[in-house]
């Protein structure tokens, strides 16, 4: 309403909700086929809060399975319950692209995933809405890589790690279709129906 004095010289009200507007996907063509752009692998080592030497196991393990040199991750804020202060090293991260990226995916799909126990696939809710898929693995998965399994005694500490697949897809549906082409399974968790008894 233009005649409303309360709206005069004021910016329009933003839509409700904290979600940002998604970019408009381009028209479907052979040039806009989603592809795998890069992979981030990171792990957090809580034992490094008390002893920084525990970071060496994570750094060596990530370098062995990716053939790339990882970087140390430092905490941005402090947590009193964990005795963690800002600026302390707590983990490591590595970014891989190109041929090392596809080599890592091949080892993950062909060697690690078939040997994981009680792992039923990546949940469908693992996307961020922009075509990036994240998945977490326990510490037992790290020891299944051939580079780590052959030198298991050289790694005093095994830790879990997270893998983030960055794709050029605009939606999670396209990203899941892309990763399923790499034989990465997805699991749709079905809710159990509760038996409701009707009182007569």
Model regions: which residues?
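N-terminal, positively charged regions that mediate nucleic acid binding
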Residues: 1-53
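An acidic, glycine-/histidine-flanked metal-binding catalytic module
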Residues: 155-200
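Short, charge-patterned binding micro-sites
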Residues: 29-48, 74-94
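Active-site phosphate-binding and catalytic loops of NTP-dependent enzymes
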Residues: 2-7, 25-30, 49, 68-74, ...
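A common structural junction motif
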Residues: 65-66, 111-119, 182-189
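Ordered, soluble secondary-structure elements with a strong preference for glycine-centered loop motifs
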Residues: 48-56, 98-103, 169-173
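Long, charge-patterned amphipathic alpha-helical coiled-coil/hairpin "stalk" segments used as oligomerization
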Residues: 69, 81-164
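A glycine-rich, hydrophobic loop/mini-helix early in the fold
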Residues: 36, 56-81
């Amino acid at each position: 309403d233009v005649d409303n004095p309360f709206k005069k010289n004021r910016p329009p009200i933003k839509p409700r909700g904290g979600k940002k507007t998604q970019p408009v996907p381009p028209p479907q063509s052979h040039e806009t086929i989603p592809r795998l752009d890069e992979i981030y692998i990171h792990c957090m080592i809580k034992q490094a809060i008390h002893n920084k030497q525990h970071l060496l196991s994570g750094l060596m393990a990530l370098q062995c399975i990716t053939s790339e040199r990882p970087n140390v991750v430092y905490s941005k804020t402090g947590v009193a319950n964990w005795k963690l202060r800002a600026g302390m090293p707590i983990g490591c991260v590595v970014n891989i692209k190109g041929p090392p990226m596809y080599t890592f995916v091949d080892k993950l799909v062909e060697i690690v995933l078939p040997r994981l126990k009680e792992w039923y696939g990546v949940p469908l809710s693992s996307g961020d809405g922009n075509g990036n898929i994240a998945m977490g693995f326990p510490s037992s998965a790290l020891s299944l890589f051939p580079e780590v399994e052959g030198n298991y005694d050289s790694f005093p500490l095994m830790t879990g790690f997270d893998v983030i697949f960055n794709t050029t897809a605009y939606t999670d549906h396209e990203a899941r279709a892309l990763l399923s082409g790499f034989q990465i399974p997805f699991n749709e968790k079905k809710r159990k129906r509760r038996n409701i008894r009707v009182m007569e």
